[in-house]
Amino acid sequence: MSQHTSQYVFNSKEDYNVILDNMSREFEERWNHQTQSPYTNLENYITRAVLGNGSFGTVMLVREKSGKNYYAAKMMSKEDLVRLKQVAHVHNEKHVLNAARFPFLIYLVDSTKCFDYLYLILPLVNGGELFSYHRRVRKFNEKHARFYAAQVALALEYMHKMHLMYRDLKPENILLDQRGYIKITDFGFTKRVDGRTSTLCGTPEYLAPEIVQLRPYNKSVDWWAFGILVYEFVAGRSPFAIHNRDVILMYSKICICDYKMPSYFTSQLRSLVESLMQVDTSKRLGNSNDGSSDVKSHPWFQGVDWFGILNQEVTAPYQPTISGAEDLSNFENFEFKDRYKSRINRHPELFANF
């Protein structure tokens, strides 16, 4: 695979573990070869629209001036990043985006900066958020949910093989492409670690008990969140959602795994969710040396063509309607906000290596 593509043809006759080993070596080379972004602002791109606004930045639709390609540009204010203590996270996000190459993960195309802002140039995935589609249809049937869950499981397997903990799995961080396949985005909380860490981060509803209790944790927190995601796909709600958004009450429920299993879940889905959402990490599905294989071989995934999914040969149950690169119908309407322009370089020492 080249630096600026995520295309990879997976041969079903090859041992997938060998393929992952090769991808790990390629990841390591990119991880160890990081470059600083030039101070070119967005001068090589034409801004066409705003795709979204987040707590740490704005995502814009841009078109390159030298060609016809469209991209998503994530613009982040240096001042906001410093104020919100996100400096390490943004460096980390760029690092991961630059090194990771997998069909279901967003990757870095380009990066740039100016006196006030940092920019990550990413592939345009204009089918919208899986969150928005899921909210519209309310629930997925199990076959539909399995299609997305299989891709997420493969993406987590890849990240864990690269010694990455994702730590922010939720429908809002999953995008749909024009063929109906997923792209996981937002790697601000992703951390490269061989063993355990203890940082409190993530989204409350998806936090594993050990994170809530401020105990050291490992990559199995991603499999806990995966269990919540699959539950939410089919139930139409998070297992620990609280109507009045009482986070303390939610945390107490998470710590004792207090939730209701819908009666319409099949026995296989019930088993998968129960196996993933285990408070005792030694019993949690995915938390072994062969963790991802244990998840993929669970009866709920029986019949999944894993190589067919990897090569995107399986027809998606839903394909977003997209008329062209500037079709923003799958996104909410956002307005441009004026960008301030300083005459001095903001925090050059903090962002020198970005």
Swiss-Prot record:
Nucleotide-binding recorded as keyword: yes
Active site: D168
GO molecular function, one term: cAMP-dependent protein kinase activity
Annotated signal peptide: none
Superkingdom assignment: Eukaryota
EC code(s) of this entry: 2.7.11.1
Pfam families: Pkinase
Gene3D superfamilies reported for this sequence: Phosphorylase Kinase, domain 1, Transferase(Phosphotransferase) domain 1
Keyword terms, alphabetized: ATP-binding, Kinase, Nucleotide-binding, Serine/threonine-protein kinase, Transferase
UniProt-annotated binding residues for ATP: L51, G52, N53, G54, S55, F56, G57, T58, V59, K74
Tissue: More abundant in adult body than adult head.
Domain AGC-kinase C-terminal per the UniProt entry, residue ranges: 302-354
UniProt cross-references to SMART domains, sorted A to Z: S_TK_X, S_TKc
Catalyses which reaction(s): L-seryl-[protein] + ATP = O-phospho-L-seryl-[protein] + ADP + H(+); L-threonyl-[protein] + ATP = O-phospho-L-threonyl-[protein] + ADP + H(+)
GO term, biological process aspect, one: signal transduction
Segments forming domain Protein kinase: 45-301
Keyword ATP-binding: yes
GO cellular component, one term: cAMP-dependent protein kinase complex
Enzyme class: transferase
Protein family (similarity comment): Belongs to the protein kinase superfamily. AGC Ser/Thr protein kinase family. cAMP subfamily.
Entry-linked PANTHER family: CYCLIC NUCLEOTIDE-DEPENDENT PROTEIN KINASE (PTHR24353), UT01108P-RELATED (PTHR24353:SF152)
Name assigned to this protein: cAMP-dependent protein kinase catalytic subunit 2
Native species: Drosophila melanogaster
